[in-house]
């Protein structure tokens, strides 16, 4: 039976200028210089070495695989001086059978390269391309007769449920490395009860009255257990959870899950943290998911690359509908076509069984560069056809650059389309969002459209009583999102909307808002310690958990004699108190405003049913100068 042995500790890292240090995995060499601005983080080749004793296994009956869950971006793997593998693509799993080269004591060498080149994506984008072995490395010890481990990082099982009314047919294909194997497949419910069973590498199993995976409302998961035997002896076993669900998109009504109208409203997410880069832990993943769920989102765009399998599992468990994509981004490279194909094949094969995933994203803002347009369009057709061939059960989509017009041919290749639009941030005019959506829907009424990105920078240390576009204040970010969430309510035909971004993230080329190296469009800060006011706006609209939030608590010094107090809540009635006295009680929806005559010190409390929030404001002669963006700091501009 298979066994797993982690290889996470005591690696020798040889960095730039032959600098050496002992590190544990996960690790990136850009955790600091990839987040501090200047667009000067090290992109090049580094080396990792590890010595290890031969793992315990029976060489007559077992094999040993070396598995990498993520090495960015290109890697060469050598064991005991023998070059065993080269892998291009920094976000997917790959494995190597190392059985034949193992000795009693072994040396593993991994050369990792994130340097600029013209063939491996991504190369140009508004985020840091951290180099390193930033996900788990481990041994898989398996019987010589086992489920396949050699095909594009697959786990050897492919599960395709088809549901009609009160029954589901679950097509399960297993792939083995021997023709002598007998395979038994069981489907178990969440209580561990076997609800269907069959024998063979290609079976159709029937489930009567299946419980459907229904997003946040009921993310019910079944488990497929495949057992491989040879001459009656169990040699290998794999388990894989899956969900039974249907979905569709109506260009006039939006997204449907299991026949029920299910508007998709959510966030995008990058996989990095302050001071860690992309070398993050399961605890970090859990923290991210908990906050996204608290927000009330029901969908996540996992941008702009394949994320950790652990996070896709969390999406399955928590009921998040997922847009999954490859990093074919910003600029088409004629020499990179094969890499887009290989990354898409790996994405689909490694993630096919996740019920959370409903769309494959083929590219992001690819028309930023206008070079090689014909080859770029052809590459999109190739990827779109590949997705449909490998997975006819899901739809395809792409994210269009803001300057990509509605008539651009690239916007009409995939099944669905999303636009990355920052109208009201990079360009003035909130109303342009309504204008664009109405025009597109008028001209292309049968083309499903969503917003794949929208957002505004917001710094929790910058504030203004009169927020303006480009000032990076927490107040303007909230003002922007207040408009956008109402805009989307006016256009119910949209198939999805994604805030850019759930969390601030590193973009080393940026220098804006007084903190270089960062994109501050997150609803939560990079260290995950501060939820900006905009976070609570979406929570007020999307979450059913009772809460109330007083906005502007970080603008605690105010010079105006009468100040506006804004409250976000999902409760229908709010009472505002100052220094223990009731100021006013209001009924409304989501956003409440009160006019408060300022005293010298103001202990303010908002009460909504059983929940409350409090803050303290001080009446000052002048506005606090620390709230304003310093003159030497750059204001908002697009990264392109």
Which functions belong to the PLM regions below?
Residues 1-304, 314, 318-322, 343-346, ...:
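Secreted/periplasmic carbohydrate-active enzymes, especially glycoside hydrolases
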Residues 171-173, 289-292, 299-541, 545-564, ...:
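Substrate-binding/catalytic cleft of secreted carbohydrate-active enzymes
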């Amino acid at each position: 039976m298979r066994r797993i042995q982690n290889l996470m500790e005591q690696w020798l890292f040889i960095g730039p200028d032959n600098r050496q240090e002992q590190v544990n995995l996960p690790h990136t060499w850009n955790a600091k210089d990839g987040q501090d601005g200047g667009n000067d983080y090290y992109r090049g080749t580094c080396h990792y070495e590890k010595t290890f004793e031969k793992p315990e296994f029976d060489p007559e009956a077992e094999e040993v695989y070396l598995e990498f869950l993520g090495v960015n971006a290109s890697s060469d793997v050598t064991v005991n001086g023998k070059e065993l593998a080269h892998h291009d693509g920094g976000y997917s799993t790959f494995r190597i059978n190392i059985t034949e080269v193992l000795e009693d004591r072994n040396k593993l060498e991994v050369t990792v390269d994130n340097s600029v080149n013209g063939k491996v994506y991504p190369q140009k984008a508004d985020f840091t391309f951290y180099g390193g072995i930033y996900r788990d490395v481990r041994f898989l010890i398996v019987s010589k007769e086992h489920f396949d481990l050699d095909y594009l990082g697959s786990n050897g099982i492919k599960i395709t449920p088809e549901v009609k009314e009160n029954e589901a047919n679950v097509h399960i294909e297993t792939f083995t490395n021997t023709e002598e194997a007998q395979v038994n497949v069981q489907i178990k419910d969440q209580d561990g009860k076997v609800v269907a069973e069959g024998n063979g590498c290609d079976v159709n199993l029937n489930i009567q009255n299946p419980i459907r995976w229904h997003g946040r409302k009921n993310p019910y998961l079944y488990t497929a257990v495949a057992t491989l035997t040879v001459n009656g002896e169990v040699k290998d076993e794999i388990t894989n959870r899956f969900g039974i669900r249907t979905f569709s998109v109506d260009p006039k009504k939006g997204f449907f899950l299991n026949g029920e109208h299910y508007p998709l409203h959510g966030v995008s997410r990058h996989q990095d943290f302050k001071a860690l880069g992309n070398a993050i832990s399961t605890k970090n993943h859990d923290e991210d998911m908990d906050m996204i769920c608290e927000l009330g989102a029901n969908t996540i765009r996992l941008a702009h690359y394949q994320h950790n399998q652990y996070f896709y599992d969390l999406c399955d468990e928590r009921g998040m509908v997922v847009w999954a994509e490859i990093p074919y981004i910003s600029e088409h490279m004629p020499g990179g076509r094969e890499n887009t194909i290989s990354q898409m094949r790996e994405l689909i094969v490694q993630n096919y069984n996740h019920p959370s995933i409903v769309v494959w994203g083929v590219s992001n803002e690819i028309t930023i560069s206008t070079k090689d347009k014909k080859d770029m369009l052809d590459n999109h057709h190739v990827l779109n056809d590949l997705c449909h061939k490998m997975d006819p059960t899901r739809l395809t989509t792409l994210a269009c650059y803001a300057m990509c017009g509605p008539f651009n041919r690239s916007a009409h290749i995939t099944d669905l389309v999303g636009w990355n639009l920052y109208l009201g941030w990079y360009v003035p005019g909130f109303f342009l969002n309504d204008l664009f959506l109405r025009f597109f829907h008028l001209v292309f009424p049968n083309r499903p459209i969503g917003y794949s990105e929208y957002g505004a920078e917001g710094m929790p240390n910058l504030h203004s009583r009169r927020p303006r576009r480009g000032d990076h204040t927490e107040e303007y970010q909230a003002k922007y999102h207040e408009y956008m969430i109402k805009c989307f309510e006016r256009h119910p035909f949209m198939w999805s909307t994604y805030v850019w971004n759930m969390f601030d993230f590193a973009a080393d080329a940026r220098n804006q808002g007084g903190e270089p190296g960062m994109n501050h469009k997150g609803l939560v800060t990079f260290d995950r310690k501060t939820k900006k006011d905009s976070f609570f706006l979406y929570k007020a609209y999307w979450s059913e958990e009772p809460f109330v939030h007083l906005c502007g608590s970080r603008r605690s010094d105010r010079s105006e004699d009468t100040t506006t107090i804004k409250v976000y809540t999902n409760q229908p009635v709010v009472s505002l108190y100052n220094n223990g006295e009731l100021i006013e009680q209001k009924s409304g929806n989501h956003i409440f405003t009160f006019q408060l005559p300022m005293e010298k010190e103001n202990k303010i409390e908002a009460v909504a049913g059983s929940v409350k929030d409090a803050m303290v404001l001080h009446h000052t002669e002048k506005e606090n100068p620390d709230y304003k963006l310093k003159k030497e700091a750059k204001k908002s501009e697009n990264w392109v």
